[in-house]
Curated annotation (Swiss-Prot):
Name recorded for this polypeptide: 5-dehydro-2-deoxygluconokinase
Annotated GO MF terms: 5-dehydro-2-deoxygluconokinase activity; ATP binding
Family matches, as PANTHER family: 5-DEHYDRO-2-DEOXYGLUCONOKINASE, HEXOKINASE FAMILY MEMBER
Protein family per UniProt: Belongs to the carbohydrate kinase PfkB family.
PROSITE patterns in the record: PFKB_KINASES_2 (PS00584)
Length: 332
């Protein structure tokens, strides 16, 4: 059963809030970054990737974020526009802040890492005054991402967006997206992530991310079921806990659980899997699919993206996912 109810007759299906950055993916693989000489530039940031994936699948998508007043900022907004994402609520930073950069290292399909530059970044300067209630109430769903909670004023902007969403019956998806380098401490992270999760209808994260959120609770022993049930006393209707190559499990408030598998593919790199999973999973739910079917879409989308060099550029269309699912081996 799909427990989500989306308001009809709204111009946007999904509005995402948060990080807009640039990925620089290594062109030379099977070697460390010290030996990498060239990189290819892509738009990045988890909420950006999810929005791009959703738009490519056909959802009417908008974005609330902030970009730097330079070539990188213009590259980001131009790319979003090219992918039919509304950018009316992406102001330009005027303080001299820069675009966050993510350099990727692909030593092997199993050994990938990311080097992040996140000092003085424009996306964390999003101010609450730049969050429009009228814009949010025009959407069926809102996606928030944990990285945007790391610092003020972006933190307050996200919580204001959450309040507007709750006020206007906008379904809230929370992608945990934990990046430790942006935060001062795990305690700070846990506090704000928990506050955001309490206001969310769907929470999506890895087992490790949920473990981080539970560190202040002094659980003697936690597991996926314990984690999910904790959130059902708040707004959550669906909690998805991802286990990498072992697939994912979705729990619902009515006590059901659904296990999602993966599709075999030739893996190039591991990053991008979570964002592509989320975009297709959200799309499936918004199309009225049952949770297991939406999870299959997410798993197929993730397998496609990890076989490609980019994240945002590799986000598949609905036809590409369908064609892939017809031929790829599914492991449940």
């Amino acid at each position: 059963m799909n427990p989500l109810i989306f308001k009809e007759n709204r111009p946007f299906d999904l509005i995402a809030v948060g990080r807009l950055c640039v990925d620089l993916n290594a062109n030379e693989t099977q070697r460390p970054m010290e030996e990498t000489r060239t990189f290819t530039k892509y738009v990045g940031g988890s909420p950006a990737n999810i929005a791009i994936g959703a738009a490519r699948l056909g959802l009417q998508t908008g974005f609330i974020g902030k970009v730097s007043d330079d070539q990188m900022g213009r590259f980001i907004t131009g790319y979003l526009k090219d992918n039919k994402i509304n950018t009316d609520q992406i102001p330009i930073d005027c303080t001299g802040a820069v675009t966050g950069l993510a350099f990727t290292e692909i030593k092997s399909p199993e050994d990938c890492s990311i080097l992040m530059y996140r000092d003085n970044v424009a996306d964390l300067n999003l101010d609450p005054t730049e969050v429009s209630e009228d814009y949010i109430k025009q959407s069926k769903a809102l996606l928030i991402s944990g990285t945007a909670l790391a610092k003020s004023p972006s933190r307050e902007a996200v919580f204001l967006a959450l309040e507007y969403a709750r006020k206007h019956d906008v379904v809230v998806f929370f992608d945990v997206d934990y990046r430790p380098y942006t935060w001062q401490s795990e305690a700070e992270t846990a506090v704000y992530y928990n506050l955001a999760a309490e206001k969310s209808d769907v929470i999506i994260g890895t087992r490790e991310e949920f473990d981080m959120m539970e560190k202040l609770l002094n659980y003697e022993k936690s597991n996926d079921q314990v984690t999910a049930e904790r959130w059902f006393s708040h707004h959550a209707k669906i909690v998805v806990i991802k286990h990498g190559g072992d697939g994912s499990i979705a729990y619902t408030r009515d006590g059901q659980s659904h296990r999602g598998g993966i599709f075999k593919t030739k893996v190039l790199k591991t990053f991008g899997a979570g964002d592509s999973y989320a975009s297709a999973f959200i799309y499936g739910l918004m199309q009225g699919l049952e949770i297991p079917q939406a999870m299959r879409l997410g798993g197929a989308s993730a397998s496609i993206v990890i076989s490609k060099h980019s994240c945002s550029d590799a986000m598949p269309t609905r036809a590409e996912i369908s064609a892939f699912m017809e031929t790829a081996e599914e492991l449940v």
